[in-house]
Amino acid sequence: MTVEGETPKRCPECNSEHLIRDYEHGELICADCGAVIEDAYIDQGPEWRAFDSDQDERRARTGSPMTYLSHDKGLATEISWSNKDYYGKRIPHKNRAQIYRVRKWHQRIRVSNAAERNLSLALQLLNDIGAKLGIPKDIKETAALIYRKAVEKNLIRGRSIESIVCASIYAACRKVNIPRTLDEISKASEVNKKKIGKAYRHLAKELDLNLKPTTPFSYISQFCNKLDLDKQAIVISEDIVRQAMSMGISSGKGPTGIAAAAIYIASVKVGKPRTQKEIARISGVTEVTIRNRYKEISKALNISISE
């Protein structure tokens, strides 16, 4: 039950915790099933309207909010690359070479040493990987904060920037209970999965992250959504996982494999069968793993389906 005025923590339709606040439309949306949970959220943005970026800049009375995604936290002045002045007029060609030199030196001053240069590159990489994964800005901000803490404690030494960035994203996703698999992050970043896992364990230990272990429930909505399976399949999958966990079948086994096997069974039960190959592709586990988990679950729960 949700107390009046309190923000819901789970989607009432699919029970997912992956909720996104759309401030522009005043809505709280489930990222997994698309349900609009709230539609009357008060817009805390400016009272004025702007119809293009130039008008937006002219009407704004404050700068951009502080962000961990910029090496200077967004507090420094930036010179626009649009070749327009404050009033939106184009800068004459005769002055553009001078503006280019000013802009170039300004960039050099903003990133004045190797440490700042490395941080700037790392945060740009974090932004790029985050965009490929489709994760919201608040998770990227959390990942950037984790990365900054790693830099402060000198945890980057002896490891690649890429692996620590990926590990920070993985940790941030787990922290807000919207886990992404190591396979997903590896594909988006082209960094070896084992290196990411090793870097993550290093960060978790040294930064004392204390993240709870992921469970099969964390992946079911996400996987079902990718497989175009409805709420009924999600409910059945979760019920199968619940029974499997109560019988100790999931002990010592990867949560993604258990979730994938449960979804395989559920998809057949709801009349929308998905092949083990399809499920393996979106879950990042092998067909052999799905087959083994399926056999263990079906035997323990006495489930019989026509494959």
UniProtKB/Swiss-Prot annotation:
Each Sequence repeat, start to end: 124-207, 218-299
Keyword field: Metal-binding, Repeat, Transcription, Transcription regulation, Zinc, Zinc-finger
Keyword Zinc: yes
Entry-linked Pfam families: TFIIB (PF00382), Zn_Ribbon_TF (PF08271)
Record bears the keyword Metal-binding: yes
Any single GO CC term annotated in Swiss-Prot or TrEMBL for this entry: transcription preinitiation complex
An individual GO BP term: transcription preinitiation complex assembly
Annotated positions binding Zn(2+): C11, C14, C30, C33
Gene3D superfamilies recorded: 1.10.472.170, Cyclin-like
SUPFAM superfamilies referenced in this protein's UniProt entry, alphabetically: Cyclin-like, Zinc beta-ribbon
Alphabetized GO MF terms: DNA-binding transcription factor activity; TBP-class protein binding; zinc ion binding
ZnF endpoints (TFIIB-type): 7-38
NCBIfam families referenced in this protein's UniProt entry, alphabetically: PRK00423.1
Family the UniProt entry places it in: Belongs to the TFIIB family.
Protein name as it appears in the record: Transcription initiation factor IIB 2
